[in-house]
């Protein structure tokens, strides 16, 4: 059975379509179809109803939508009052502070102890009260005079000197000597070969 789509509805083309519209039907036995002619009492194929009105969609109740609109119009929304009741920027700051506190207590101050930062450190700004075993080594600043002396004699070194810190003294020295050679670069002009 062939079908066509017209304005969102599905129309089935068959021999009974003309009878439903009130037009003359083709005489029995003279049509192109091999089907039997419909009976006059309605027991044949002509009494069958079309299926185009069956849909899977539920129909909306117009009264229900109008009552919800009235409820929405009746309520006044005060955006300033809503903003006063809940300040979202404070929530974000608090979440970030909690994340920093957990990272700070886990990795920096307590280093593996299962205590909260608020329990381990009474005040956040008072870091000097922390035990020496839980704090990192302090770095010493090298005066500029000593630093320039190290740079002047660096070309004579065969390997890097041992650092003052105990962390770097365990590293193996380089087997190759350090060479500080000056390198000069020259720009070549492209030759036009065409």
UniProtKB/Swiss-Prot annotation:
Induction: Constitutive expression with no clear cell-cycle regulation. Expressed in somatic and reproductive tissues. Disruption phenotype: No visible phenotype and no meiotic or pollen development defects. Pans1 and pans2 double mutants are lethal when homozygous. Transmembrane segments: none annotated. A motif (DEN-box) lies at residues 14-16. Residues 28-48 are annotated as: Disordered. One of its GO terms (biological process) is maintenance of meiotic sister chromatid cohesion. Residues 28-40 have a biased composition (Low complexity). A motif (D-box) lies at residues 48-50. Coiled coil: none annotated. Patronus is Latin for protector. Not required for protection of centromeric cohesion. This is Protein PATRONUS 2. It comes from Arabidopsis thaliana (Mouse-ear cress). The lineage of its organism: Eukaryota, Viridiplantae, Streptophyta, Embryophyta, Tracheophyta. The gene is PANS2.
């Amino acid at each position: 059975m062939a079908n066509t789509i017209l304005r969102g509805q599905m129309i089935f083309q068959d021999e009974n379509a003309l009878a439903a519209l009130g037009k003359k039907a083709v005489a029995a036995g003279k049509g192109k179809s091999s089907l039997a002619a419909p009976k006059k009492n309605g027991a044949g194929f002509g009494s069958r109803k079309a299926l185009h009105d069956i849909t899977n969609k539920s129909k909306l109740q117009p009264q229900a939508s109008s009552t919800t609109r009235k409820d929405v119009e009746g309520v006044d929304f005060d955006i300033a009052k809503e903003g006063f009741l809940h300040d979202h920027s404070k929530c974000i700051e608090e979440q970030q502070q909690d994340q920093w506190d957990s990272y700070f207590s886990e990795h920096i101050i307590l280093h593996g102890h299962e205590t909260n930062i608020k329990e381990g450190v009474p005040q956040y700004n008072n870091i000097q009260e922390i035990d020496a075993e839980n704090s990192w080594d302090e770095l010493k600043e090298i005066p500029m005079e000593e630093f320039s002396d190290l740079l002047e004699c660096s070309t004579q070194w065969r390997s890097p000197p041992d650092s003052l810190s105990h962390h770097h003294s365990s590293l193996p020295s380089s087997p190759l000597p350090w060479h500080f050679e000056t390198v000069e670069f020259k720009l070549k002009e492209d030759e036009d070969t065409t």
